Amino acid sequence: MAASPYYLRQTHAPDCACSVCWSVRQAIPLHNPSPCPDCRPPGLPYLEGGRWLCRPRSFCAKHDPSRRPPKYWHVVYDSGKPTPFVPVREDFQLEG
């Protein structure tokens, strides 16, 4: 089914409420400029010598992600020296 040439490439009104215009208004731009002037976003891919290349992204010292996993042991309660496990071989009675 061919679309009528009357409808092709027609601009929508500024206050159009159709789903296409709504989704365009809701879209988040892909390449957000970095708030930090020292951080460099990745470059757009370009063709050089038959191979696609891309300038890598780089971060400043403040925003450089750590290569180690995040520390999570700060949430564990430290109750002091560990108590070793001593198995009891004989039965005992509670006093009381």
UniProtKB/Swiss-Prot annotation:
InterPro entries: PflM. It comes from the Viruses. It holds the Pfam family DUF5447. This is 10.9 kDa protein.
